[in-house]
Amino acid sequence: QYPIEVPGVSNFTFLHTAFNSVLQHQGSEPMPEGDFREFLVQKLKLVGMKPEYLDRPVNTGFSGGEKKKNEILQMAVLSPRLALLDETDSGLDIDALRIVSEGVNKLRRADNAIVLVTHYQRLLDYIKPDFVHVLLNGKIIETGDSSLALKLEEKGYDWLEK
């Protein structure tokens, strides 16, 4: 929910190191800094961040919205096959929610999975899930489509506790 701050490590260094680690794991050559910076500028546009963010320490002094955008930027750069976004809508104003949601939607692919944890239906106004699962005491007690989220918003959780 609350991305950690990493004082002394710039976003650029963090992302470049992580990206090259992925390339190395895949048996590819590392990407030179100049090429990576060009690649990264395109990814910044996805989340509405300015290039100046790259020189700032990771999440240090970032607003809640900036931290969430930075998480989506990391997803855009690293292209994970599985991403877990825990309450990514927490603390976001409506503009930041829209930008973060657009980023998540653009990163959806047939070869990846995004697990999105939220307590509020408003995120689902922007991101249409394939499935909605309700957890209670560590177990999935109900599964459905986005209409399940609307029902939860309307009725709460009490009707599920049998």
PLM-predicted stretches and their roles:
Residues 87-88, 95:
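Walker B catalytic motif
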Residues 93-98, 143:
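Conserved D-loop-proximal element of ABC-family nucleotide-binding domains
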Residues 96, 120-123, 127-128:
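Helical "lid/switch" subdomain of P-loop NTPase nucleotide-binding domains
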Residues 111-119:
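Conserved H-loop
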Residues 126, 131, 135, 139-162:
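Conserved beta-strand-loop-alpha-helix hinge in the C-terminal portion
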